């Protein structure tokens, strides 16, 4: 027989709680700053998809036009999720008129942008112009085709000259990738201002006859 002084190996975990009652140390702590930051980050992540609201979405559907998120769902390969590119963190910025993403289309990565007409009629300001220019430049650097879904009222007038600056930056970026990667521009609805000029700089343009 083994001596009582010899410690025998065992698979039992000495820290296991054998009773159904959890010790006080196992009680989940109250939410702290980290939990609040995670919650706020999740709200910011979903803000672009919820910025419009049911009324504006209904108006878009009444015009027999899809929202930008529905167009992305049609474009992407089944079973894949778009990688939405965020930049405009802050009040009324992300989700304000422009969505940029990387999607799997036909088995390859494609850079995609689309105006969200349900928010500010898809109009552009300087911040969103930079966001658009960034995804265009990304397409050129990574050798990805670019698909643009244009549904915009042009520059955001309350932003003043900033709206024109935004389109100027996007125009410059699109011209620089011309001949480097193909760009397919789709026209939806009644585009005005830069919303009608920018697509003409693409490799191909698709628009309805009316």
Residue ranges and their predicted role:
Residues 2-184, 190, 195-197, 201-210:
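Terminal-region recognition feature
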């Amino acid at each position: 027989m083994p001596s009582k002084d010899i410690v025998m190996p065992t698979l039992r975990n000495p820290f296991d709680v054998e009773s159904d009652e959890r010790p006080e140390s196992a009680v989940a702590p109250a939410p702290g700053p980290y939990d609040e930051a995670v919650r706020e980050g999740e709200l910011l992540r979903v803000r672009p998809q919820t910025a419009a609201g049911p009324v504006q979405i209904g108006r878009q559907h009444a015009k027999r036009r899809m929202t930008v998120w529905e167009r992305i769902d049609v474009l992407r390969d089944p079973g894949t999720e778009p990688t939405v590119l965020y930049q405009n963190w802050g009040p009324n910025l992300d989700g304000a008129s422009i969505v940029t993403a990387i999607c799997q289309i036909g088995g390859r990565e494609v850079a995609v942008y689309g105006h969200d007409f349900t928010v500010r009629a898809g109009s552009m300001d300087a911040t969103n112009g930079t966001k658009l220019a960034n995804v265009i430049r990304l397409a050129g650097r990574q050798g990805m085709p670019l698909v643009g879904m244009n549904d915009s009222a042009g520059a955001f007038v309350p932003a003043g000259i900033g709206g024109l600056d935004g389109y100027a930056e996007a125009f410059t970026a699109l011209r620089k990738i011309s001949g480097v990667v193909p760009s397919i521009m789709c026209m939806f609805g009644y585009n005005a201002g830069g919303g009608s000029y920018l697509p003409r700089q693409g490799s191909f343009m698709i628009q309805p006859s009316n």
